[in-house]
C-alpha cells in the first residue's frame, strides 16, 4: 500500500495495524466511524515484522523507564535529608515525565503501553489481540528487569541498602489499603489513557493527537504524589516485578501480589467504565 513503511508490509496480516495511542479514526470529512474490534487471537501477527518491532519498542521503553526512575529513587534514598534531594515531588516528576517522553516516542510503533495494566485494559476493550497483549507484557517485564539490573550494576551497595526501588506496603497501612491504592491509582491512569486516545475525540478538528502523552504522563505524576507514601506507587506490574527480582529480599515479595492484582483490577474497571458507561458501545445500534 502506498505511503506505508516497507517493513510494515513484510508478512503483514489481513488486519490493519492498531496503535491505540496517538492514532485517529476519521474520514476525509472528519466524520466519526467506530473502529472495528481487534481479533481475539491473530496468529498471522507472528509473521509480521511490525509485530516484533513493537515488542522491541516496549522492551526498550520499559528498560529506560526503570533505569531513570529507579535511579531517581536511589538518589532520594541516599540523601541525608529531603532538602538535599528532589524529594517525593522529584520522584513523581521522574515517573510522569518518563511516561510522557516514552509514550511520545513509541506511540506510533507499539502504541506506547509500557505497562502490563495498560495493555490488559486495552485488550479488554478489544484494542489489540491476545497474541499482541501477551507479547507486550512479556517484553515489558523483561525490559523492567534489565533496567533495574543496570541500576544495581552501577551502584550495587546503595541499591541493596536503599531498597532497590521495590514496592512494599508502608508501615502503618494494611494490605487492604495498599490494594485499594493500587486499584484506584491504576484506574486513574488507564481511564486517562482511554480518554486521551479515544477514536471519537481524535476525529474532531480541534483534537491534536500528538498531545495524548501529556495527560497520560500527568496522570502518572499525580498518582505518584498521592500513593508514594502508601505503596511507593506501583500501578505498573512490570515496574514492580523488575525491582523486586533484582532487589530480591523477602519483604519485597511479601506483598508483591498486590502490585499485580491491584493494577489489573483497576485496569479492568477503567476499561469497563469507559466502554460501557462513557462510550456505551454495547448499546449502540449496528448500522
From Swiss-Prot:
<feature type="transmembrane region" description="Helical; Name=2">
    <location>
        <begin position="93"/>
        <end position="113"/>
    </location>
</feature>
<feature type="topological domain" description="Cytoplasmic">
    <location>
        <begin position="197"/>
        <end position="209"/>
    </location>
</feature>
<feature type="modified residue" description="N-acetylmethionine">
    <location>
        <position position="1"/>
    </location>
</feature>
<feature type="short sequence motif" description="NPA 2">
    <location>
        <begin position="236"/>
        <end position="238"/>
    </location>
</feature>
<comment type="similarity">
    <text>Belongs to the MIP/aquaporin (TC 1.A.8) family. PIP (TC 1.A.8.11) subfamily.</text>
</comment>
<keyword id="KW-0597">Phosphoprotein</keyword>
<comment type="function">
    <text>Aquaporins facilitate the transport of water and small neutral solutes across cell membranes.</text>
</comment>
<dbReference type="GO" id="GO:0009506">
    <property type="term" value="C:plasmodesma"/>
</dbReference>
<feature type="topological domain" description="Extracellular">
    <location>
        <begin position="155"/>
        <end position="175"/>
    </location>
</feature>
<feature type="transmembrane region" description="Helical; Name=1">
    <location>
        <begin position="56"/>
        <end position="76"/>
    </location>
</feature>
<keyword id="KW-1133">Transmembrane helix</keyword>
<protein>
    <recommendedName>
        <fullName>Probable aquaporin PIP1-5</fullName>
    </recommendedName>
</protein>
<keyword id="KW-0007">Acetylation</keyword>
<feature type="topological domain" description="Cytoplasmic">
    <location>
        <begin position="114"/>
        <end position="133"/>
    </location>
</feature>
<dbReference type="InterPro" id="IPR023271">
    <property type="entry name" value="Aquaporin-like"/>
</dbReference>
<dbReference type="InterPro" id="IPR034294">
    <property type="entry name" value="Aquaporin_transptr"/>
</dbReference>
<feature type="topological domain" description="Cytoplasmic">
    <location>
        <begin position="279"/>
        <end position="287"/>
    </location>
</feature>
<feature type="region of interest" description="Disordered">
    <location>
        <begin position="1"/>
        <end position="34"/>
    </location>
</feature>
<dbReference type="InterPro" id="IPR000425">
    <property type="entry name" value="MIP"/>
</dbReference>
<feature type="transmembrane region" description="Helical; Name=6">
    <location>
        <begin position="258"/>
        <end position="278"/>
    </location>
</feature>
<dbReference type="InterPro" id="IPR022357">
    <property type="entry name" value="MIP_CS"/>
</dbReference>
<keyword id="KW-1003">Cell membrane</keyword>
<dbReference type="GO" id="GO:0005886">
    <property type="term" value="C:plasma membrane"/>
</dbReference>
<feature type="topological domain" description="Extracellular">
    <location>
        <begin position="231"/>
        <end position="257"/>
    </location>
</feature>
<feature type="short sequence motif" description="NPA 1">
    <location>
        <begin position="115"/>
        <end position="117"/>
    </location>
</feature>
<feature type="topological domain" description="Cytoplasmic">
    <location>
        <begin position="1"/>
        <end position="55"/>
    </location>
</feature>
<feature type="transmembrane region" description="Helical; Name=3">
    <location>
        <begin position="134"/>
        <end position="154"/>
    </location>
</feature>
<feature type="transmembrane region" description="Helical; Name=5">
    <location>
        <begin position="210"/>
        <end position="230"/>
    </location>
</feature>
<feature type="modified residue" description="Phosphoserine">
    <location>
        <position position="285"/>
    </location>
</feature>
<dbReference type="GO" id="GO:0005829">
    <property type="term" value="C:cytosol"/>
</dbReference>
<feature type="topological domain" description="Extracellular">
    <location>
        <begin position="77"/>
        <end position="92"/>
    </location>
</feature>
<dbReference type="GO" id="GO:0015250">
    <property type="term" value="F:water channel activity"/>
</dbReference>
<keyword id="KW-0472">Membrane</keyword>
<keyword id="KW-0677">Repeat</keyword>
<keyword id="KW-0813">Transport</keyword>
<feature type="transmembrane region" description="Helical; Name=4">
    <location>
        <begin position="176"/>
        <end position="196"/>
    </location>
</feature>
<dbReference type="Pfam" id="PF00230">
    <property type="entry name" value="MIP"/>
</dbReference>
<keyword id="KW-0812">Transmembrane</keyword>
Amino acid at each position: 500500500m502506498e505511503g506505508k513503511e516497507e517493513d510494515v508490509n513484510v508478512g503483514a496480516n489481513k488486519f490493519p495495524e492498531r496503535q491505540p495511542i496517538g492514532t485517529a479514526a476519521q474520514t476525509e470529512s472528519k466524520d466519526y466511524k467506530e473502529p472495528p474490534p481487534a481479533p481475539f487471537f491473530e496468529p498471522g501477527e507472528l509473521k509480521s515484522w511490525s509485530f516484533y518491532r513493537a515488542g522491541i519498542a516496549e522492551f526498550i521503553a520499559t528498560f529506560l523507564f526503570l533505569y531513570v526512575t529507579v535511579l531517581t529513587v536511589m538518589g532520594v534514598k541516599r540523601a541525608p535529608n529531603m532538602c538535599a534531594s528532589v524529594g517525593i515531588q522529584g520522584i513523581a516528576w521522574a515517573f510522569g515525565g518518563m511516561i510522557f517522553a516514552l509514550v511520545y516516542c513509541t506511540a506510533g510503533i507499539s502504541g506506547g503501553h509500557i505497562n502490563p495494566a495498560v495493555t490488559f485494559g486495552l485488550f479488554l476493550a478489544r484494542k489489540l489481540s491476545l497474541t499482541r497483549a501477551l507479547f507486550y507484557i512479556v517484553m515489558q517485564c523483561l525490559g523492567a528487569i534489565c533496567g533495574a539490573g543496570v541500576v544495581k550494576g552501577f551502584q550495587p551497595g546503595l541499591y541493596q541498602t536503599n531498597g532497590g526501588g521495590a514496592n512494599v506496603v508502608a508501615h502503618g497501612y494494611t494490605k487492604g489499603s495498599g490494594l485499594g491504592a493500587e486499584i484506584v491509582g491504576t484506574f486513574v491512569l488507564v481511564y486517562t489513557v482511554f480518554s486521551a486516545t479515544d477514536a471519537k475525540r481524535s476525529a474532531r478538528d480541534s483534537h491534536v493527537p500528538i498531545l495524548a502523552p501529556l495527560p497520560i504522563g500527568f496522570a502518572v505524576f499525580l498518582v505518584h504524589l498521592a500513593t508514594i507514601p502508601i505503596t511507593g506507587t506501583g500501578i505498573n506490574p512490570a515496574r514492580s516485578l523488575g525491582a523486586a527480582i533484582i532487589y530480591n529480599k523477602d519483604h519485597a515479595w511479601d506483598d508483591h501480589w498486590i502490585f499485580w492484582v491491584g493494577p489489573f483490577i483497576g485496569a479492568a474497571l477503567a476499561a469497563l467504565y469507559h466502554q460501557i458507561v462513557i462510550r456505551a458501545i454495547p448499546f449502540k445500534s449496528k448500522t
